[in-house]
Amino acid sequence: MEDVIPAKRTFGRTIMETRKELGLSQKELAAHIQREDGTPISNQYLNDIEHDRRSPTGRHLIEQLAKVLKLGPDYLFFLAGQFPEDVRRHTPDPEHFAQAWSAFRRSLKDGGKR
């Protein structure tokens, strides 16, 4: 029997899979996500995000996606390669950061058990 290699977890893949799990179409989700000027994002823009061709242009979009899709915003910020505002304001010294990062990596190897 052939081993199946799991697909890499990306921002776009997470958005698409969660949207489908919630039974939302791209059109329905796009209508709930608004740009800073209050207009909804386009279906094509959402499609580009889901297929990792584009990244969300603003923090507010990530926060809205997290809320509508019932996902943790910190997780989406991580997948998008961004740090939440409170983390950016309190950037630790290099030694503290290295210790925290090492602990995080160990927790991943342990399957999140700690």
Where are these regions (language model features)?
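Short, solvent-exposed amphipathic helices
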Residues: 64, 75-78
